[in-house]
């Protein structure tokens, strides 16, 4: 084990660690209602998304077929978002207490792939294409606001408003409306890619930005609440724990690793719905 750490961790090893932490996090997420799952599962799980993000940054940078890479991420993200949309609007397949999964990290990664390609085009001095790619992601929510303002009658037509809602939550999501991740996750992803090649600078800047967004800003809002005590930043508002993923990122040795290529794509949706289904059965059994 010490020898492996000395030699660093390859991409497969980092993903495996992230996968294990993600499972702990989602066990807490889906079975928290039992009161039997320790919060530490969720705390450890805060490191999972940043690690997967880092691995996706490296994967996108090194893949030989970016279009296929993007389509795979887009396809999985769109399918999961479509099912989530169905649960929200049709109120189908919900757990007895009304709970349904809001796991949409692939949509964040899909949007980031577009931004990363834009960053590369800017590096290649293809300024028009680069700016257009990044602007498409950033401006899409505002385009939709302008569109709905120009045609307010759409919101009065149930079928039309449903179609629009589906489009902007599933195949063409707004970065402001994704139910998993946050704007700090997207900003962090853009920074990780833009600063690739300078590992210490990359991770220092990323960690500072995440700490500012998820600790400092959160603390500023939380401290206005009556009864808030600073220790709640370690027991309730612990999203910022993800910053410690930088320590594992530092161990990355630049190697892709062997095996499990497809596992990391399909394990995410598979384990989400298996755990969700199990939680539904367990909830019904406890009633």
Predicted features and spans:
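Alpha-helical transmembrane segments and their immediate juxtamembrane cytosolic regions
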Residues: 1-287
